[in-house]
Amino acid sequence: MPTIRPDEISTIIKQQIEQYNQEMQISNVGTVLQVGDGIARIYGLEKVMASELLEFEDGTVGIALNLEEDNVGAVLIGSGRNIQEGSIVKATGRIASIPVGEALLGRVVDPLCNPIDGKGPIHCTETRLIESPAPGIVDRRSVYEPLQTGITAIDALIPIGRGQRELIIGDRQTGKTTLAVDTILNQKGQDVICIYVAIGQKQSNIAQVVNILSERGAMDYSIVVAAGADSPAPLQWLAPYCGATIAEYFMYQGKHTLVVYDDLSKQAVAYRQMSLLLRRPPGREAYPGDVFYLHSRLLERAAKLNSRLGEGSMTALPIVETQANDVSAYIPTNVISITDGQIFLESDLFNAGIRPAINVGISVSRVGSAAQTKAMKKVAGSIKVELAQYRDLEAFAQFASDLDEATQKQLARGQRLQEILKQPQYSPLSLDQQVAIIYAGTRGYLDDIPVEKVSSFKQGLLSYLGTAHPKYGEIVLSTKQLTDEAEEILKTAIAEFKQSFLAKAA
């Protein structure tokens, strides 16, 4: 029979009394009235705040979106399969936040920054709110530094600056994602941190982008935030804000960041789905009334900070998909009005073999020209006018049988300019290479080269410049200008190469 030791019992009781804490925990709780389709209606939670995180009995997290008189409408982040009518819900008193830090570089994460690449946990010491206010007017400065995309047509005609928001818009399968990925690849060695946000994409497409970035060594300075087509609507809605939050962390440390949102049409569709299930009144195209605010509060977070805040920047490249080239639909017009310009890709140009399929006529950059390098400004000044004139003449030439010599020359020049702006995917060019190609095109060096041989001439000239005249590239890349010395070297190189090229062709 065990012996009872009173001294031990009294010691334990004393310890329990000493450790007793009178502090009461008051929780704001409610009960689930209805659940389904990723939406829960909850009774109670009288003191809940808009966008507050809610915790369900099974551990599922929700966000309170509709605060009504007798119930709260919440979206579920997760499957919510184990939530039943009558389940207890607790308000957490917190707003959605994610861990941020250098440890995210090279990783693929979901919109809550949980790793999904199988490379183990991510250890971040800091957290940031997913929804945070954009920098104010006094915190910004105007865009003045170029963000080189490596795509000649963009850097010459529609230049982008650090801190700008440039929309990439076009039908499906016109090369929108390719443009964005090329831009990320071109940031290698430029000290720019890139965030690629995939919203509602097929898993195979996301895997393809990650593979390309890994193969080219771009994942060292990139982060991929993925909310695939099979992700719940709330995660597709949150994904762009997660990308912006990660970029903000680096921006406020004085670093340069680039965020690609691929694509905001699918985010708007996910938000429409949530809003209709929450019984919010539908507006144009069944989108809710605040769909403009959905995108404006996201894109306004892109900025070029002033010197007091460290001169960091966040450049945004939102992508929007159109139906049958209709840029006057609701979401495209909204995003066009928010951004600082757009790059319009056309399926007709793409099918005609002009890739990147940029329609130079309606593509604009409202602030990027201030950030264009002097070297590019010097050579690209006339190319836009010449291309516009070529398009007009091309339409006219279809109906006219006999054209005067000047018109024929202009058409021939335009064809060659169009040819030099063609570029294969995943092969961005450096500034000195772009300047050399445009210089050769606008100064008439290609006028007597057959159109079908312009592409091989271009490739040959670039390799010849790199091997025979490396000083040209050194001058342009170090000064960002086409100095008199560099121009003389370039003229000599083009003349030498052209002579050998024509001799071989003959």
UniProtKB/Swiss-Prot annotation:
The record marks S363 as: Required for activity. InterPro entries: ATP_synth_asu-like_sf, ATP_synth_asu_C, ATP_synth_asu_C_sf, ATP_synth_F1_a_nt-bd_dom, ATP_synth_F1_asu, ATPase_a/bsu_AS, ATPase_F1/V1/A1_a/bsu_N, ATPase_F1/V1/A1_a/bsu_N_sf. It is an enzyme of class 7 (translocase). Its EC number is 7.1.2.2. ATP binds at G170, D171, R172, Q173, T174, G175, K176, T177. Gene3D superfamilies: 2.40.30.20, ATP synthase alpha/beta chain, C-terminal domain, P-loop containing nucleotide triphosphate hydrolases. GO terms for molecular function: ADP binding; ATP binding; proton-transporting ATP synthase activity, rotational mechanism. Produces ATP from ADP in the presence of a proton gradient across the membrane. The alpha chain is a regulatory subunit. HAMAP family: ATP_synth_alpha_bact. Belongs to the ATPase alpha/beta chains family. This is ATP synthase subunit alpha. It comes from Synechococcus sp. (strain JA-3-3Ab). The lineage of its organism: Bacteria, Bacillati, Cyanobacteriota, Cyanophyceae, Synechococcales. The gene is atpA.
